[in-house]
Amino acid sequence: MKVSIIGSTGRVGRATALCLAEEEAVKTLHLISRRESLEQNIGEVLDMSDALAAKGVSVKLENSADIENVHGSRIVVITAGVPRTADMDRDDLAFQNGVIVAEYARQIARFAPDSIILVVTNPVDVMTYVALKYSGFHPSRVFGLGNHLDSLRLKNYMARHFNVHVSEVHTRVIGQHGPYMVPLISSTSIGGIPIEHYARRDYFSGYRRFDLKKTIEKVINAGSNIISRKGATEYGPAFAISNIVTTILNDERRILTVSTLMEGEIDGIRDVCLGVPVKLGKNGIEGVVPVLMDRDERETFREAASHVRNSTMKVMEFLDEELPL
């Protein structure tokens, strides 16, 4: 199947391209850049071709600066946008990136009307809403990377703390991809044992030293921490994107936490895009999976909805003047 990446010369776009090129389900990978970055885009394809040959991988690689070449794509990944700096809040990007995402969403709807759109551009929850409205697609076919990467980060930190394999940690982060993210600690388990039991029994000596508040702060600040040291996040987002894309192409029906339009499924929240667990299959989102939250988690989730909704309304009002629907 064909997958297109818009913004393929950016650091996340490049890393994502290499990840997806190695996936058997991806038969054609089309990399789209701005016209002024076309030479770099060509170079990326040539370099990637050599790498894939060394691994014995055969995939058709294409590149262009023309958005109409998304035609025939099963999935279009939008990574294009102004990158975030370490001292910049994701919401600071909203107005600039809103214009970029809105324009691309319109063109995707025109040239690839049957495709699925995966939004990566930050602030991802707001940009997912923008892409949804400007594409006119059904919500099942437009969603964002959301809290999938945040969930993986939390799993990783907890696995390292308790010295267990990451697959033994079952946890999830929902809400906003940002300060209002909600780690669902109340339903977290390690090796099938609810984490709350670790406080009552000596399963692992590390439990009493586990600082939940610091761990949550670590997840929230993970992106900024990486950006301040190397200038951008690349590999984490790329592999998380690859998880989502291959889940769809292989019709795996996995439950992943992505940013999607809320329509009352959780706590009656509507008309805002938030990270929640969904079942993903070949046609996109097959349904939102209900979650159990304690009182504090529910309160933070509602705060996330309020914050993201306010940010989204401001961006949509701005876009209504710049790019009327």
Curated annotation (Swiss-Prot):
Q: Does the keyword NADP apply?
A: yes
Alphabetized PANTHER family for the sequence:
L-2-HYDROXYCARBOXYLATE DEHYDROGENASE (NAD(P)(+)) (PTHR43128), L-LACTATE DEHYDROGENASE (PTHR43128:SF16)
Transmembrane residue ranges: none
Q: Where does NADP(+) bind?
A: G7, S8, T9, G10, R11, V12, G13, N97, V120, T121, N122
Q: Which GO terms describe its biological process?
A: lactate metabolic process; tricarboxylic acid cycle
Q: Which reaction does it catalyse?
A: (S)-malate + NADP(+) = oxaloacetate + NADPH + H(+); (S)-malate + NAD(+) = oxaloacetate + NADH + H(+)
Q: Tell me, what does this protein do in biology?
A: Catalyzes the reversible oxidation of malate to oxaloacetate. Can use NAD(+) and NADP(+) with similar specific activity.
SUPFAM superfamilies, alphabetized: LDH C-terminal domain-like (SSF56327), NAD(P)-binding Rossmann-fold domains (SSF51735)
UniProt binding sites for substrate: R84, R90, N122, R153
| Family per record | Belongs to the LDH/MDH superfamily.
Q: Which organism is it from?
A: Methanothermobacter marburgensis (strain ATCC BAA-927 / DSM 2133 / JCM 14651 / NBRC 100331 / OCM 82 / Marburg)
Which keywords belong to this entry? NAD, NADP, Oxidoreductase, Tricarboxylic acid cycle
Enzyme kind, highest EC tier: oxidoreductase
Q: What is this protein identified as?
A: Malate dehydrogenase
Catalytic residues (positions):
H177
Statement: the UniProt record of this protein carries the keyword Oxidoreductase? yes
| InterPro entries assigned | L-lactate/malate_DH (IPR001557), Lactate/malate_DH_C (IPR022383), Lactate/malate_DH_N (IPR001236), Lactate_DH/Glyco_Ohase_4_C (IPR015955), NAD(P)-bd_dom_sf (IPR036291)
- Stated EC number for the protein is 1.1.1.299
Q: What is the lineage of its organism?
A: Archaea, Methanobacteriati, Methanobacteriota, Methanomada group, Methanobacteria
GO MF annotations in UniProt: L-lactate dehydrogenase activity; L-malate dehydrogenase (NAD+) activity; L-malate dehydrogenase (NADP+) activity
